[in-house]
Structures are given as structure tokens and as C-alpha cells.
Amino acid sequence: MSGKPPAIFLMGPTAAGKTDLAIELTKVLPCELISVDSALVYRGMDIGSAKPSKEILAAHPHRLIDIRDPAESYSAAQFRADALEAMAEITARGKIPLLVGGTMLYYKALIDGLADMPADAAVRAELERQAEALGLAELHRQLAEVDPESAARIHPNDPQRLIRALEVYRVSGESMTAHRQRQFAESRGADAGAGGHLPYTVASLAIAPTDRHILHQRIALRFSQMLEQGFVDEVRSLRARSDLHAGLPSIRAVGYRQVWDYLDGKLTENEMRERGIIATRQLAKRQFTWLRGWPEVHWLDSLACDNLSRTLKYLGAISILS
């Protein structure tokens, strides 16, 4: 192993069993858990995010859970800073950071760093007004004219990323794509603090059922269980807050946006259930796309009964624990 301290990434699609395996690992390895999930950062969003129970969190603490109010935003850059700080604290105690979750953009930000992008609150507010007045399709058309690479990457119905890409261009006169390419070239060889390489030897694990149909069944079952556990009431409580609205990143989380639309009268209960399940399946598909391109990832089958021993064998084989 290199002179860098070890870290473990436990990735995978939603409903694959990541948390269960992570907890088992903490029982046999000197690991501490860091959540890598863009929905779990929000307080009061427990059922729809499949947040581990209070009992589980008390017995097996996860960092970066319940660190933001739903009215606040939380970016990949903020995650990277928080995760690096948590990893350093864990390593200083002689423990191994075990990062678990399915927000692949966060993992990428941690590994590759993020270019500092220009921002301007007034420009962003104007773009938000344009989105409301003209629609997201018009914003996507504008982005395609000035930054076709970003437009091809960003879904036309993703207001947060559309607005951010246009904001960067309007503030700096440079596309987000060009900005990233230039800053990446400038940061080659820099350390993690400057946005370069991660100062850890990382073991990348991914867990998922080998049969995609099984994952789809799990997703449908879990969404139904969330509804039985009071997911609609959870979203109803969020809607009762005057500072929350459907355009916030928290409320756009998979499942939450569908229940919000149901409570707004835009969907029937059956439509909400169906669209929530479909949106979760689409999320899983995007996660698989990320993982297929992830370098040196070791796959585990969710359906196997010996994933703990398989994981320990793999970690021993690559000498990350020595």
C-alpha cells in the first residue's frame, strides 16, 4: 500500500443494501461512517430519504446526516469540504473513513476536486425569474447556444444545474465547460486542498443485485413502505412551512417532488405512487451509469449471503488494511 492512509467507498444504486453492509463492516473493522447522500443531509426529511433510524444512528453514527435545513442548499463543493474534514478527523484517531451512499457526483467531487466557479446572487435571481416566466426549455436553449457541452449533459428539467451553468457564463463570459477545463489544467498535480488528488488510498466497492428486476422490485416495495410509514404526512409538514417551495433542491429530491405534486392536486394518489417508483428507478439507472465508468470498482451482489467476508477478503487482497 502507498504511504497514504486508507479510505473505503461503499457505493451502489438506491435500495441495494449499502447501509446494512456498511454497519456490518464497522463491527469488524476500525471504521467510522460518512454519509454520501444529497437527501440525507436535510433535517426532517427522514421517511422519503430512507434515512437510517434514530436507533441505528445512535448505535452507528454517520457524519453528514441532518446537517442542513430543507430551506438551505448543499453543493458538491460543500460536501467535499465537509467530507475531507471528517476524513481527516477520523484518520487522526487511527480509524478508517468508510463513505457510504449513492450520490455519485459527491464521490466524483471528492476524488477529482471541483473548479471554483464564479457566482452572483443577483444574476442567479434573474435567471430564476426567467425560468418562472419563460420555462426551463428556454433556459436550456440559451445554454445550448453558449455551452453545448453542458447543455448535452444537463437535463432540460433540471433547473438548479441549468441556472448554475448560465450563471457561470453570464458572470464570467466563459462557459462552465471551458472554466472547468482551464482550472483542471491549472490544478494538475495539486493536492486535495487545492482541488487536486485525494490524499487517501481508496478501495472502491459497489453493491447491487445482479438481477436488475430484483432491484426494481425492491424499489417498488420500499416506496410503498415509505407511504405506509407516513411519507405523505412528512411532506405535508414540509409544505406547511412558508419558506419551502417546490423549486428547492431538497424538495426536488426523488419521491418528495412526486408527493409534493400530489398534495398540490397535480397528481392522483396512484399517479404519485407510480411516478415516485419510476423516478427512483431512473435514479438507480443514473447511478449504474456512473458506476460502470468508475475505475477499479469491486462489485458485490446484494443477493449474496457472504458479502461481509467477500469484502474483507477483497480489502485484504489489495492490502489496504495493512
UniProtKB/Swiss-Prot annotation:
Enzyme Commission code: 2.5.1.75
Binding positions (substrate): T14, A15, A16, G17, K18, T19
GO terms, molecular function: ATP binding; tRNA dimethylallyltransferase activity
Annotated site residue numbers, Interaction with substrate tRNA: T103, R124
Pfam families recorded: IPPT (PF01715)
Keyword Zinc-finger part of the UniProt annotation: no
InterPro entries: Dimethylallyltransferase, IPT, P-loop_NTPase
Source taxon at top rank: Bacteria
Residues where ATP binds: G12, P13, T14, A15, A16, G17, K18, T19
Signal sequence bounds: none
Catalysis: reaction(s): adenosine(37) in tRNA + dimethylallyl diphosphate = N(6)-dimethylallyladenosine(37) in tRNA + diphosphate
NCBIfam families: miaA
UniProt record similarity statement: Belongs to the IPP transferase family.
Subunit structure and binding partners: Monomer.
Protein name: tRNA dimethylallyltransferase
Gene assigned in the entry: miaA
